[in-house]
């Protein structure tokens, strides 16, 4: 990653934080995008200031790019602000996500809109803003963070996990998968790769900890660093050899990992 400039959304905590810190440790300058700037200003632990401080203390390069991904004016300036701080971006990681558990028929429109804005519209728009420069320079990497919830449950009869309150979340991640494969086809031959990466198991991020009553008791937990390691491998691959792929962390790392109904293995 030496000499690379990466934009990572949702980088104040959880998977985004781990990816940002790992990329920085490998030599990339990282623009960290999130809403929480200072410690103690969110109900969840983690902030941009803390992640930037850790990266700088380790000898890396990083810049905080505060943004509310539900606000169009914020989204429109992310790429320009990142490039002003660190230089032209050649790597974009669309990681930011949110979920509101509950039956689809009871999901308030406001919550649905927030989910769609953060996980579908913003990745699409950031891609539109960042990728033309990558194409012009002849190289680039787009990594979309997906989920096995994007897959289709098979039934009837349907297993218990099919009614776990994740219909809207799965819809959004399915859109991300289609963005990945479609854009990879459009950009083939330009030197820009587009891939999607999901977790193989449960990652106990601060956000997941809050909604832990909704997680299956038998869900295997993968190491915190697995997604960061896998993201590094995907974004380190030559664009001509790996693009249009939807892969999962432990698969990328070549590590055995239990699968089962909790992980939506019974899918199309």
Task: Kindly label every feature range from the protein language model.
Residues 5, 12-13:
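Conserved glycine-rich cofactor-binding loop
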Residues 26-50:
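Conserved glycine-rich Rossmann-like NAD(P)H-binding loop of the short-chain dehydrogenase/reductase
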Residues 46, 66-77, 109:
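The beta1-alpha1 cofactor-binding region of Rossmann-like NAD(H)/NADP(H)-dependent oxidoreductases
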Residues 103-104, 108-113:
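Substrate-binding pocket helix/loop in short-chain dehydrogenase/reductase
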Residues 127-128, 181:
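A short, exposed helix-loop element centered on a Lys and neighboring polar residues
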Residues 143-189, 201-203:
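Catalytic loop of short-chain dehydrogenase/reductase
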Residues 174, 189, 196-197, 214-268:
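C-terminal helical subdomain
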